[in-house]
């Protein structure tokens, strides 16, 4: 993905968002939900992996 094209297209996106705000707001809400869900799942998976590895380490040390 070319990042330059995205940044150059941003001003037009803002101008368009002034005209059809509800549509853009809906996209932003979906985008935020997806990002927050991904962050939460990654966070919990990371915690769970760490917890399981700690548990296995303590179990095998007995």
UniProtKB/Swiss-Prot annotation:
Belongs to the asfivirus C62L family. This is Uncharacterized protein C62L. It comes from African swine fever virus (isolate Tick/South Africa/Pretoriuskop Pr4/1996) (ASFV). The lineage of its organism: Viruses, Varidnaviria, Bamfordvirae, Nucleocytoviricota, Pokkesviricetes.
